[in-house]
């Protein structure tokens, strides 16, 4: 990300860090112009910048993590695919006359192994977001996803899904086309697939839109991603009739990776580089790639029957609690 882009998309809590880094760059440029050695001073400031970065990103509130998950420069599904796949060939269409650009998928090679990868795709700017419907998939998108997963099952390829959506498309047309049925069908059929399934929340995991490609043997979540039954804004509007109370809603909804790991909903948190994925996208992709390869190796050691049984048990246990 360029300096101008970073300034444009700067979040409030990132400003102290950005100002310090800008000062470091300014000192470095002045030193080069005047042929002055300030390496010791710069090293000291860089250590302070790293300390500040750790301090900021280790104490984020749920609403701040939501801002990171929605960051315009956060890596998308296609960004991760292009970074981690040795080969990639996109497949199109639901075989029912529709090809939803909000949900992409295809065949790839990951760590030398053939896999099928699919996920929701947001846009980079307003025009692209409109074309991608802001990552909100239609019924045709979920049917395309199921077609690709059935194909992966036929050819014994592990399935990787990337979840990044505020929710499934909720328009009248989507309801006419069977949005609820399409998501429910995917939920049922993903429990029946023989191959390993790894689902990863890479950004925003919203409601049924996330669930439609979210049934797997392992549910991973990037450190600063969020996973939620409803957006905090919607929750605040419903409960308190005031969207300004979304920070309180974000806290109550338990949307962060650490909360969801503690609750047993996700299986593993994938760490992000210092400063979050949008600041170092390639490093974030490498961390995710290794986790995916290791998880596929682990799941491949199980039989299809074992995977299906454990997958079913995993989701049956979600929400179980004991009262003293």
Curated annotation (Swiss-Prot):
Q: Which EC number(s) are documented for this chain? A: 2.1.3.15
Q: Which residues form the CoA carboxyltransferase C-terminal domain?
A: 44-298
Top-level EC class as recorded in UniProt? transferase
Q: Which residues cross the membrane?
A: none
Kindly state one GO CC term assigned in the UniProt record: acetyl-CoA carboxylase complex
For molecular function, the Gene Ontology terms on record are:
acetyl-CoA carboxylase activity; ATP binding; carboxyl- or carbamoyltransferase activity
This chain's function reads: Component of the acetyl coenzyme A carboxylase (ACC) complex. First, biotin carboxylase catalyzes the carboxylation of biotin on its carrier protein (BCCP) and then the CO(2) group is transferred by the carboxyltransferase to acetyl-CoA to form malonyl-CoA.
Q: How does it assemble?
A: Acetyl-CoA carboxylase is a heterohexamer composed of biotin carboxyl carrier protein (AccB), biotin carboxylase (AccC) and two subunits each of ACCase subunit alpha (AccA) and ACCase subunit beta (AccD).
PANTHER family, sorted? ACETYL-COENZYME A CARBOXYLASE CARBOXYL TRANSFERASE SUBUNIT ALPHA, ACETYL-COENZYME A CARBOXYLASE CARBOXYL TRANSFERASE SUBUNIT ALPHA, CHLOROPLASTIC
Q: What is this protein called?
A: Acetyl-coenzyme A carboxylase carboxyl transferase subunit alpha
Recorded name of the encoding gene: accA
